[in-house]
Amino acid sequence: MTRKVTGKALNGALLEEVGLDHEVVHLAIEQTYNLLDKVDATLVAEGVFPLSQTVELANLSSMIGNIFASALANHSNGRFKRNGPHKYPDLLSADTKAYPDLELKMALERNKPKGHLAKPGYYITCRYVLCNTQGEPMFEKGNRGVTPYIWELRCGYLGEEHFAISNTEGDSGKTAVVNKEGMIALKVVFLDIDRAPLSQKGKVFAEYVSLLEAGD
């Protein structure tokens, strides 16, 4: 059975400026869930753990991102096509005068999205959580769920100033993490608040509630 996409669509005008809309996003999330569930079902049938328990979380994020980017292109009515693996940006615009190329960045739970270089451009950031088989989120480190659900999508333009550069010894090479100002510059376009990895008594959760109450 296909998983239902739950969540609130926001900032539709911003999505339209970059060549997308809420229907495209909804269908892309749905296709991503459907494919991930098929992969998990095949793995389990062969006596293998689900994908989220078979690969490291960094690799899982990359896999989900690649699937979601392809799904966005599939449902974009020809406005975008998927770029090759490990190539920037992820989504190539069919008409750059009408709407820009888009880069997709993934992150688990409340982590800030990151890449290897601080490249100015238009971004979609996707943050997800791991839930149990009933779709209930499990955030405890070492006791996370097995099924990925997207809880937040953001969209907007990022400049070099919106990244924090790290090149410390022991790090996984040079990294560029979206900083606080960058997260503010990116506007929420999809929010599944019931699966947000936040304390419902906290300030951040209250800010998300206010965002939902304000509407699109």
Model-derived regions: residue spans:
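Active-site beta-strand-loop-beta-strand hairpin of nuclease catalytic cores
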Residues: 92-101
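Nucleic-acid endonuclease domains
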Residues: 1-89, 106-216
